[in-house]
A protein has these predicted regions:
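Buried, small/hydrophobic-residue-enriched core segments of structured protein domains
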Residues: 13-46, 54-57, 93-94, 99-121, ...
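Structured loop/turn residues at beta-strand edges in well-structured enzyme cores
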Residues: 6, 272, 324
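Single conserved hydrophobic/aromatic residue that forms the stacking wall/gate
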Residues: 1-14
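Short coil/turn segments at secondary-structure boundaries
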Residues: 86-87, 155-159, 173, 471-477
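Gly/Ser/Thr/Ala-enriched C-terminal appendages of enzymes
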Residues: 13-45, 49, 58-60, 65, ...
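Hydrophobic residues within beta-strands of alpha/beta enzymes
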Residues: 212, 277, 305, 327-329
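Residue-level recognition of short, solvent-exposed, well-ordered loop/turn junctions
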Residues: 6, 115, 121-122, 432-434
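N-terminal, Lys/Arg-enriched amphipathic/low-complexity engagement segments
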Residues: 43, 47-103
């Protein structure tokens, strides 16, 4: 079933794709109107924006962050072309001096991010932008667009792969994706999340990842009979011979004809290495069990039995519970669209401001009637605490950027909303990792992304730091994201200050 192979060189085709598709105007109009407002009323402020999300996708307990490489490429290639300026001028909104500024625009700020493939949780910054206010404002929309999409698909893929319990998941969703880019980059994210490969040839070319595929019902129907179709395909692809057996009747026609072809291959001395059948409809549990019996009786008990047909993590988990004899899964629509959770929900919020004549950032906070939507102020970082014996995540701690954690010190963690919920972590029992790393400094890339297959391997290790209770699909155990005492005090003081002003 593996038609393509992984290339040996680091792929730069993705960067060429991003350059060929100028994404500078991939922004909401109000980012540009605000930029003109800042331009006309200059403050020379440097600001900090945090990109984070509030609710885990698909009812789970975690997410997988993805899309960082494309975000970096977007930042590197920010440039308003003459055509861009001409179009903006035609809107009759922007003045000539502002358009002149845009014609020479470059991003000069710093960006920190959590590496792709990392397990992440609500309210912790996935991306932190530190830049002049006009620059930080412009990049909001594209950062959200890129990170939200790929993180959603990577998370869905991680769930699907977990349900498969080690079986290969093939990403088959291109034809159902919401457009070419969703198909290309969704497949990339799906592989980061754990898929073995994709049917999308362009994704394979751009990212040097395995491309996978069998054949369609139309192949069978174009021949006089099913056997001839199978035999012809087997001659063409003897080392990747997976036969689709449900065009007419799985058990009466498809499997018997597949067995006949396999027997003939064996008699002709053709090695049966990567071979098997695919079932795309019907009762997959029953049909796979019966097909396995037939294959085993003919001496082909090692044949791969692949299934497709609107699969997702819930159906795969159910089929596993029914002891379905399936060991390879083609997952399309419900993966590439994350159909039960169509949006990731990431947001981009101002956290701090520094005036031109100041050396310190002033923390900012956004209020809400919903307590969980009140933002965390200031210049922050994120630490992850691991249990030293098990390697499992104990908690994440959002701190102010100047705070350092000492793993030898005792620590009291508390819930930032229900502050009476506390736990003590003894020094020497945990390890600490800072999650945010610099990826852009003064507008230049300082981070080289691993290959997609390396990110996939990293993501598997990341997921192994979760307890199984946090990976189950129904009522998963929450992983706690706490605030340091210093950050919590700052947040409380700002809330009290705003509350007092409201009473004046």
């Amino acid at each position: 079933i593996l038609i393509g192979l992984v290339g040996s060189e680091m792929c730069i085709r993705d960067r060429l794709y991003m350059r060929a598709n100028n994404l500078t105007l991939l922004t909401d109009l109000y980012e540009l109107t605000m930029m003109q407002g800042y331009f006309k009323n200059p403050t020379n402020q440097t600001v900090i924006f945090d990109m984070f999300y509030r609710t885990n996708p698909c009812g789970g307990a975690f997410a997988i962050t993805a899309g960082l490489e494309q975000m970096i490429e977007y930042i590197e290639n920010l440039k308003f072309t003459d055509e861009d300026i001409k179009y903006l001028r035609s809107l009759n909104i922007f003045e000539e001096d502002f358009l002149e500024y845009l014609s020479n625009f470059r991003f000069t700020g710093d960006i920190y991010a959590i590496p792709e493939g990392t397990v992440v949780f609500p309210r912790e910054p996935l991306v932190k932008v530190v830049a002049p206010i006009m620059e930080a404002q412009l990049v909001e929309t594209a950062i959200l667009n890129i990170i939200n999409h790929q993180s959603l698909i990577a998370t869905k893929a991680a769930r699907v792969c977990y349900a498969a319990k080690g079986d290969a998941i093939m990403e088959f969703g291109l034809r159902r994706a919401q457009g070419p880019d969703a198909g290309i980059f969704g497949a990339r994210a799906a592989i980061i999340g754990g898929c073995a490969g994709t049917s999308c040839v362009l994704t394979g070319k751009m990212f040097d990842v395995p491309v996978l595929g069998t054949h369609a019902h139309s192949w069978i129907m174009s021949f006089p009979d099913e056997y001839t179709a199978f035999k012809t395909y087997a001659k063409l692809y003897p080392n990747a011979c997976t036969l689709l057996v449900d065009t007419y009747d799985v058990l009466k026609s498809g499997v018997p004809n597949a067995i006949r072809v396999f027997e003939e291959m064996r008699e002709e001395g053709i090695p049966l290495t990567k071979y098997g059948i695919r079932i795309d409809s019907g009762d997959l549990a029953y049909l796979s069990k019966e097909a396995y019996k037939m294959l085993a009786a003919a001496g082909f008990d090692d044949a791969v039995i692949s299934a497709s047909s609107d699969l997702d993590e819930y159906l795969i988990e159910s089929l596993k519970a029914q002891d379905a004899k399936i060991n390879s899964w083609g997952v399309g629509t419900r993966l590439i669209t994350a159909n039960d959770n169509p949006a990731f929900g990431g947001v981009y919020k101002l956290a701090a401001v520094k005036d031109a004549d100041s050396t310190e950032f002033t923390p900012k906070i956004k209020l809400s009637e919903n307590t969980e939507k009140v933002t965390n102020p200031g210049n922050k970082t994120v630490y992850r605490l691991y249990n030293k014996k098990t390697g499992k995540i104990r908690a994440d701690l959002i701190c102010l950027a100047d705070e350092k954690l000492d793993a030898d010190q005792n620590m009291v963690l508390f819930d930032p909303i229900d502050t009476w919920k506390k736990t003590k972590v003894l020094g020497g029992t945990y390890e600490v990792r800072e999650l945010l790393v610099p990826v852009i400094r003064e507008g230049k890339r300082v981070y080289e992304s691993p290959s997609v297959m390396e990110l996939r391997e990293y993501c598997q290790k990341e997921q192994n730091t979760l307890w199984d209770e946090s990976r189950r699909f129904v009522n998963p155990q929450k992983v706690y994201v706490d605030l340091s005492q210093k950050l919590w005090d700052l947040k409380k003081d700002l809330l009290e200050e705003i509350s007092e002003k409201a009473l004046d």
